A protein has these predicted regions:
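Short intrinsically disordered, low-complexity coil segments enriched in acidic
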Residues: 1-4, 111, 154
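Active-site/binding-pocket entry motifs
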Residues: 6, 78, 147-148
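Short, flexible helix/strand-to-coil boundary loops that buttress conserved ligand/catalytic motifs
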Residues: 13, 41, 60, 129, ...
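Short, flexible, basic/aromatic active-site loop/helix in glycosyltransferases
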Residues: 144-154
Length: 154
């Protein structure tokens, strides 16, 4: 998902580039994610774009030069995560998928996460982490079995 305005990074984006295209170690943050997905065998990508999304489309195109296939869903109004899920339902056809924010830097073993998901017979699996700055983040409450029992939106 790469549709947000990136207001908290305005000093870096200057409303000229979308937040997922902020350079990290010489290349756009979103490129790091695309490469990580490819390394994990995930090559059919759908990018949800919005504010300045044309810059993402111009950079990545159909994804061929990066060894992946990229389709786009363009938000004309911000829908949030739930809204994106709703509008993507016809594009994913009930297939297994990974959904992630385009403005995160991570090193996730997606194959391990997918195996965990399948072993648990889960409907959905969330990759979460402890957070030392809860004032600007969504928060989850988990039970002893790591099941989500509550959600507190930022």
């Amino acid at each position: 998902m790469a549709g947000g305005k990136g207001t908290r990074l305005a000093a870096l984006t200057k409303d000229e580039i979308p937040k997922p295209m902020v350079p990290v170690a010489g290349k756009p943050l979103l490129l790091w994610q695309v490469e990580r997905m490819k390394e994990n065998g995930i090559t059919d990508l759908i990018m949800v774009i919005g504010h300045l999304g044309n810059k993402i489309k111009e950079y990545f195109g159909d994804g061929e030069q990066f060894g992946v296939s990229i389709r786009y869903f363009e938000e004309t109004e911000p829908l949030g995560t739930a809204g994106s899920f709703y509008y993507l339902k016809d594009m994913i056809h009930g297939d297994r998928f990974v959904m992630m924010s385009g403005d995160l830097f991570f090193d996730i073993d997606f194959q391990r996460m997918i195996r965990f998901h399948e072993e648990k017979g889960a409907v959905a699996t969330l990759f979460v982490h402890p957070n030392g700055h809860p004032f600007d983040s969504d928060l989850l409450v988990l039970d002893a079995n790591d099941k989500v029992t509550a959600f507190d939106s930022k």
